[in-house]
Amino acid sequence: LPYSIVNVHSGKHRVSSSSSISNDREAEITVDLVLKLRKKALKIGIITFYTAQVRLIANLMRAKNVVPAGSDDDVFASTVDSFQGSEADVIILSCVRTSKTSAGFLSDSRRLNVSLTRAKKKLIVLCNADALAGGGETLEMLDLKSLIENAKTRNVLFSESEPKIFSSFTASSSTRFWTARIARRITSSSTTTPTAASCHSRSSTRLDA
């Protein structure tokens, strides 16, 4: 499976009143990606491990009029748990966490496997690669670190500021194999431009009006 990793090094996760967490910068980049990818008439799935991030992304998309009423079948946001059994042409995975000491749901092998295997054509992972590189030593974290290192080798690890993150859907067969191997290993073990910060108070997770 062709994949890219975007190192969102400037983002910081925050804890919501419901104890779920979100990441403003990852949400903003996610919406920017959707704006670019919708021109290709693809079904886009946005998945994340946290309900607060789903709400934030949905609210930001609505605020920017990214998804008109009734078109949520083409672009949708969901938690990993709710997404099981579903697929999309493109999956944008927002990892959210930026802590080097706590991986949270990233250390859950079942959730991680689901998140890495739902894309038909392209997987885009948004994460703080620097934080993950300094994370724990569980099998799942080691696999994530290996995925990041492989992305570096294949020149598919981008900084959040690089326009290359909107590149074409091409990848070598060995890149596809690498992602599949990681998944198998895990299985076995207004006039004002809206910002993410301005969308936190809205509660709905639906993408239609």
Q: What is the predicted function of each stretch?
A:
Residues 1-59:
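Conserved helicase/translocase motor-coupling segment
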Residues 14-16, 55-57, 86-88, 100-103, ...:
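Switch/connector loops and helix/strand junctions flanking conserved nucleotide-binding motifs
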Residues 23-29, 53, 84, 108-111, ...:
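Helical mechanochemical/support elements of P-loop NTPase systems and associated helical scaffolds
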Residues 32-33, 76-79, 109-112:
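Eukaryotic intrinsically disordered and solvent-exposed regulatory patches
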Residues 43-45, 62-79:
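Conserved RecA-like helicase motor-core motifs
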Residues 50-51, 77-83:
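Conserved helicase motor
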Residues 61-63, 102-208:
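Helicase C-terminal subdomain and adjacent C-terminal extension
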Residues 78, 86-98, 114, 122-125:
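A short beta-strand element within the Helicase C-terminal
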